[in-house]
A protein has these predicted regions:
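Repeat-based blade/solenoid architectures
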Residues: 53-62, 114-126
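N-terminal secretory-pathway/extracellular module detecting exported/lumenal segments
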Residues: 49-74
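Short, solvent-exposed loop/turn segments at conserved positions within beta-propeller repeat blades
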Residues: 91-96, 146-150
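Acidic/hydrophobic-patterned starts of short beta strands in beta-sheet-rich repeat architectures
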Residues: 67-85, 134-143
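Beta-propeller blade signature
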Residues: 96-103
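Short loop/turn segments that connect beta-strands within beta-propeller blades
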Residues: 104-105, 158
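Acidic, small-residue rich beta-repeat scaffolds with periodic aromatic anchors
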Residues: 3-7, 13-40, 44-53, 121-173
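Short consensus segments that form the blades of beta-propeller domains
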Residues: 54, 86-93
């Protein structure tokens, strides 16, 4: 039994190191767009999603620059809700607009455009990048509360845009 103790100790150390070093998605880090977004991204965001009749400053939206191990290029997730604004022009009855952009050539390409209900249960993030990478971008898990209950949507990148791959209902309301 004594000769197995060093082997067991070594296995435990290797297991702890493997768990600690295992690639994890970046932690939730929504920041003010004007602080982190490249100017060409803000220009593309305005061109793709905003009308000149809406006086919206995209620099006041929130952006999360997602980068996980094995990902080819950053994914910029955009929460269209404007900080410190009484009106939210990109929000409506079904939720608020969320976008995803990746660098392409000298500009940016929109790879995600959806409306999400931003209200989720405590302890849950609205969008959770995973360590699984498809076609160069991470899978995303989107948490939503709706008429069906609490649901998780798994989105995968098909090479052009994100699409729903799986819907799991975790709790009925």
């Amino acid at each position: 039994m004594k000769r197995f103790k060093p082997l067991l100790f070594s296995l435990v150390v290797v297991l702890i190191l493997a768990i600690w070093l295992w690639p994890r998605p970046s932690q939730t880090s929504w920041r003010l767009a004007q602080e982190v977004a490249p100017l060409p991204l803000l220009s593309q965001l305005m061109q793709d999603n905003l009308s000149p009749t809406f006086p919206v400053d995209p620099g006041q939206m929130q952006i999360w620059k997602v980068q996980v191990a094995g990902q080819r290029q950053p994914l910029y997730l955009v929460d269209s809700r404007v900080k410190n604004s009484e009106t939210q022009p990109l929000c409506g009855a079904i939720g608020c607009a969320f976008f995803g952009y990746t660098p392409k050539d000298t500009g940016f390409q929109r790879v995600l455009a959806t409306y999400l209900n931003p209200h989720v249960p405590p302890g849950r993030d609205l969008i959770e990048p995973t360590a699984a990478v498809e076609n160069g971008l991470p899978q995303l898990v989107v948490n939503q509360l709706g008429a069906e209950g609490f649901q998780q949507y798994t989105l995968g990148f098909n090479g052009e845009v994100y699409e729903i791959q799986q819907i799991d209902t975790l709790a009925r309301l």
